[in-house]
């Protein structure tokens, strides 16, 4: 699997995930800087108030 891993509005970058990892995630929340977006491999557990989208195809988490 290949997932995007660039933060927020940075230029797009992606990375290959470890063998057996088939998910990518896009996690969003707001703080004093505005909306923060984190992307990567896997499908993490998040705290309430954080928007999480997980998907199962290459570069699906933009």
UniProtKB/Swiss-Prot annotation:
Q: Which UniProt keywords apply?
A: Acetylcholine receptor inhibiting toxin, Disulfide bond, Ion channel impairing toxin, Neurotoxin, Postsynaptic neurotoxin, Secreted, Toxin
Here the segments flagged for biased composition (Polar residues) are: 1-16
Question: What are the annotated disulfide bridges?
Answer: 3-24, 17-41, 43-54, 55-60
Question: Ligase: present as a keyword of the record?
Answer: no
What start-end ranges are recorded for coiled-coil regions in this protein? none
Q: Which SUPFAM superfamilies match?
A: Snake toxin-like (SSF57302)
Tissue specificity here reads:
Expressed by the venom gland.
- Report the subcellular localization: Secreted
Annotated GO CC locations? extracellular region
The family database entries (Gene3D superfamilies) matched by this protein are listed as: CD59
Xref: InterPro entries: Snake_3FTx (IPR003571), Snake_toxin-like_sf (IPR045860), Snake_toxin_con_site (IPR018354), Toxin_cobra-type (IPR054131)
Work out whether the entry's keyword set contains Glycoprotein: no
Q: Name the Pfam families on file.
A: Toxin_cobra-type
Molecular function as annotated in GO: acetylcholine receptor inhibitor activity; ion channel regulator activity; toxin activity
Start and end residues of each stretch annotated as Disordered: 1-21
CDD domains assigned to the protein according to its UniProt record, in alphabetical order: TFP_snake_toxin
Known role: Binds to muscle nicotinic acetylcholine receptor (nAChR) and inhibit acetylcholine from binding to the receptor, thereby impairing neuromuscular transmission.
Instruction: Tell me its family.
Output: Belongs to the three-finger toxin family. Short-chain subfamily. Type I alpha-neurotoxin sub-subfamily.
* Record protein name field: Short neurotoxin A
């Amino acid at each position: 699997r290949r997932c995007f891993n660039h933060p927020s509005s940075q230029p797009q970058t992606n990375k290959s995930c470890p063998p057996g990892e088939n998910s990518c995630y896009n996690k969003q929340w707001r703080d004093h800087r505005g909306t923060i977006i984190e992307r990567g491999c896997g499908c993490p557990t998040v705290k309430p108030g954080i928007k999480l989208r997980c998907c199962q195809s290459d570069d699906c988490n933009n």
